[in-house]
Amino acid sequence: VIVPCYTETAVDDRYSRQILFNGIREEGQRKLLAARVLIVGCGALGSAHAEALGRAGVGRLRIVDRDFVEPSNLQRQTMFIESDAEKRLPKAIAAANRLRDINSEIEIEPHVTDVNYSNIEQLIDGCDVVLDGTDNFSTRYLINDACVKHETDWVYGAAVGSYGVTMTVRPHQTPCLRCIFEEAPPAASAPTCDTAGVIMPIINLVSAVQVTETLKLLTGNTTDLHQSLMQFDVWRNEWRKVSIGVPNPDCPSCGLGQYESLEPISSETAAVLCGRDAIQISPSQPTSIDFRSLAERLRPSGDVKFNEYLLRFKTGPFELTVFQDARSIVRGTDQIATARSLYAKYIGN
């Protein structure tokens, strides 16, 4: 393991104001420099997490995201600029590029992949804290089960419209996500960024609380954790701190050790993407894609462009973005059956 190396002067100069803060001091700053944090999702929340932790001097940031930058992201996803959207850079890559400009002395490890049962445990390996930057409960349950299994602290967060929520999970010390939310909200029962939109202030607020909790965990200030479910509505000026009690002994995850989200899935999966008229198709077994060969095969059927990270194919009203691991985002439909049909027709089974 390579540990970032800093002189006393460099540390004191860059982080001088942070070191003055009583909760950090020099000892806390050195703990931050030696820490590794996993950020799952690098959209609105995740990019805010990444920038704050990078500037704070967390020594190693592992950033995972399955998507690429689009113009509609720029309103609230602070790590990205117009040229990232024009180039259709993967969010993890664009964030890593920006972070290296912000702080060249920390280690950035970007992963362009879909987080699932097959890779989550490898991704959290060696990490001190996991930060939630996702937009769906299935991935959060995955994070929860993996973190509970490996006793890794993680910080849940969500934001939609002007409302946000966050909670810190310390396995077997606090309730886990399944203790509080036994099941995901039924489809169409709760607002999403598709239906309610989202404003940037709630993103900043939720991320600020999540990052602050992370700093407390990394520096050992665990008695200062808020130990609650924090809820905010910045438009309605509402702030609530809901007691979460103690872990549920009958919880499938932290009580009974039944990590359902980590069980293998033998078939192709499809997921509706928040905020877009799009479906993600993931093959049951990731396969390396030769973009040049695929482009030659697809050109007679439509417009094809590719770079080292992804291939974009337009045909009629549809657009398929194919990643190196054979995942594809099918845009122009909200019907899973249609997306699967297009994937099978143009990419293969």
Regions found by a protein language model. Give the residues of each.
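Adenine nucleotide-associated cytosolic modules
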Residues: 2-349
